[in-house]
Curated annotation (Swiss-Prot):
GO molecular function, one term: heme binding
InterPro entries, A to Z: Cyt_P450, Cyt_P450_CS, Cyt_P450_E_grp-I, Cyt_P450_sf, Insect_CytP450_Detox
Enzyme Commission code: 1.14.14.1
Name of the protein: Cytochrome P450 6B7
Enzyme class: oxidoreductase
Organism from which the protein derives: Helicoverpa armigera
Localization, UniProt: Endoplasmic reticulum membrane; Microsome membrane
Length: 504
């Protein structure tokens, strides 16, 4: 008899689930904020949740759908959030009214690696930022430059040997060997040769941290749930690996700086200075002891930021040089002249002072901003200036750098690679919010100077010895890998690397 009731039960269940997973979908309509129509369960993230498109591409598409709106109401799964398009509003959120949007809002267990500068919020973030910002000053990076230089020389030797066997390279994986070497040396004081037995482990770590976990979608649907359950988005094997690595290094150095001027030395110097404190009036006084766990968390985020983002940016830069030989010719001429002026050496100042190289780098980041989207959480109710729209406390605010960087209102022919966009005169004409590869304001990327320096050094070294040419397998229409957390090339990037003395 119960079989007769089964259709009715299923119907009730389906209707109940439908109502539950659409219960918030009138949120923005009630506030007269336009936005794309959400899909049951997925909200506006169906393609990224199913790993059909990268989240950065999805955000760009939503940005483009509403060219005349200052803000766009959307849904991450069932949770309402706001995509901001207007520069005036972006500037208020990121700079002028920073205290109302100081948190990134990525909420999960802050035990282990979770207590890192990127994911920390509130006064914990402020305390970490105040203490760790000096690590990335120009002076500190200059002292660390010799470590990068050693890694770059070893990398060029490796490429030279490989060029004796072949011309075509998949440059993304190739450049990861350079950034792995540099980060291992600059962060942990470990030479690449001595960690060759750990390369396989590092590759596993890279795969895990470069591909999104569905824990992210769970956080979208049920904000704060991961934190309440004390769950982390960082897998346990990754946490164990970095804890073991950092513990061994601290033990080898007896908990004291070893005179290498690397990241670990600088952190151990900070620990000798005592607790990290913050006395911002909003939250009273917060003290944070620099424990081994805190050190491990910062080393983790330093590795992730410097390893993957730099390798990907350089890969895209080399890709564009292969397709734009006129740009490459001009850049090689600048590199040759700069090295000649430095008595045949590549110094810190050599790299920093090459204007065209820096413009090429900036244009690469315009076309391929690696971290998408930028995210902030409202710490209080906030009325958007000049509107009746109120962003309620705990609402996520998103910004699409890629959407902005490809907007023809700000960049003519945005799909064309043109480093001259970054002539000083051209930059002066644009709003500062028109270029956001590293974010903006106090929560911009603290390691951007390091990433930029190691990348510019490597490109300089490469072009001093080689030319980049398209190969028969160079994809003229690169797609973005949908499964990665960051923007990255689907299927890699294949080009020919040719010693300059035998240019074809």
């Amino acid at each position: 008899m119960w079989v007769l009731y089964l259709p009715a039960v299923l119907s009730v269940l389906i209707v109940t689930l439908y109502l539950y997973f659409t219960r918030t979908f009138n949120y923005w309509k009630k506030r007269n904020v336009r936005g794309p129509e959400p899909t049951v369960f997925f909200g506006n993230l169906k393609d990224s949740t199913l790993r059909k498109k990268n989240i950065g591409i999805v955000m760009e598409e939503i940005y483009n759908q509403f060219p005349y709106e200052k803000v766009v109401g959307m849904y991450r799964m069932t949770t309402p959030c706001l995509l901001v398009r207007d520069f005036h509003v972006i500037k208020h959120i990121m700079i002028k009214d920073f205290e109302a949007f100081r948190d990134r809002g990525v909420e999960f267990s802050k035990e282990g690696l979770g207590q890192n500068l990127f994911h920390a919020d509130g006064e914990t973030w402020r305390a970490l930022r105040n203490r760790f910002t000096p690590i990335f000053t120009s002076g500190k990076l200059k002292n660390m430059f010799y470590l990068m230089h050693e890694g770059a020389d070893n990398f060029i030797d490796h490429v030279s040997k490989e060029c004796e066997k072949k011309q075509e390279f998949e440059v993304h994986s190739l450049l990861q060997t350079y950034t792995m070497s540099t980060i291992s040396s600059c962060a942990f004081g470990v030479s690449y040769n001595s960690i060759s037995d750990k390369v396989q482990t590092l590759e596993i770590v890279d795969k895990i941290i470069s591909e999104p976990s569905y824990a992210i979608e769970l956080d979208y649907m049920y904000p704060k749930l991961l934190a309440k359950l004390n769950l982390s988005i960082i897998p346990t094997p990754v946490q164990h690996f970095f804890k073991s690595l950092v513990d061994n290094i601290i033990s080898q150095r007896n908990g004291k700086p070893a005179g290498r001027n690397d990241f670990m030395d600088l952190i151990l110097e900070l620990r000798q200075m005592g607790e990290v404190t913050s006395n911002k009036y909003l939250d009273g006084v917060t003290s944070l002891e620099i424990t081994d766990e805190v050190i491990c968390a910062q080393a983790f985020v330093f590795y992730v930021a410097g390893y993957e983002t730099s390798a990907t940016t350089m890969s895209y830069l080399i890709y564009q040089l292969s397709l734009n030989q006129d740009v490459q010719n001009k850049l090689i001429a600048e590199v040759d002249e700069a090295i000649k002026a430095s008595d045949g050496k590549v110094t810190y100042d050599t790299v920093k002072e090459m204007k065209y190289l820096n413009k090429v780098f900036d244009e690469t980041l315009r076309m391929y901003s690696i971290v998408e989207p930028l995210q902030r959480k409202a710490t209080r109710d906030y009325q958007i200036p000049g509107t009746d729209v109120v962003i309620e406390k705990d609402t996520m605010v998103l910004i699409s750098p890629r959407g902005i960087h490809y907007d023809p209102k700000y960049y003519d022919n945005p799909k064309q690679f043109n480093p001259d966009r970054f002539d000083a005169e051209e930059v002066g004409k644009r709003h500062p919010c028109a270029y956001l590869p590293f974010g903006l304001g106090q929560r911009n990327c603290i390691g951007m100077r390091f990433g930029r320096l190691q990348s510019l050094l490597c490109i300089t070294k490469i072009l001093s010895k080689f030319r980049i040419e398209p190969s028969k397998n160079t994809d003229r229409n690169l797609q973005v890998e949908p499964r990665r957390v960051t923007i990255g090339p689907k299927g890699g990037i294949r080009v020919n690397i040719v010693p300059r003395k035998i240019v074809s």
